[in-house]
Amino acid sequence: MTQHSPYSSAIAEQRNQEWLRFVELLRQAYAEDLHLPLLQLMLTPDEREALGTRVRIIEELLRGEMSQRELKTELGAGIATITRGSNSLKSAPVELRHWLENVLLKNA
């Protein structure tokens, strides 16, 4: 049995608050058309590339035409990354999944 210390709970809460602060900052940046410079400031080129790859993974998983192995070859992503994307998509709220289908697959 694993016990969670108050210290680890406090750290988790602090990290969650920092994440929510970033999300709010990004929302404000979009409202003021500063989102691209903000994201370029906050993310390295590798992180931006990884996010683009993750969008492609979700898109292809939603499309359902390729196996995870085919996605690995097509995108050059690790099988673990694709599996995490698949697991995250399975646990995503239905509303989010429908929204993603509408946005990512509308031109398919």
Curated annotation (Swiss-Prot):
GO terms for cellular component: cytoplasm. Residues 68-91 bind DNA. InterPro entries: Trp_repress (IPR000831), Trp_repress_bac (IPR013335), Trp_repressor/repl_initiator (IPR010921), TrpR-like_sf (IPR038116). The keyword Transcription applies. GO terms for molecular function: DNA-binding transcription factor activity; sequence-specific DNA binding. Its main location: cytoplasm. Homodimer. This protein is an aporepressor. When complexed with L-tryptophan it binds the operator region of the trp operon (5'-ACTAGT-'3') and prevents the initiation of transcription. The complex also regulates trp repressor biosynthesis by binding to its regulatory region. This is Trp operon repressor. It comes from Salmonella typhimurium (strain LT2 / SGSC1412 / ATCC 700720).
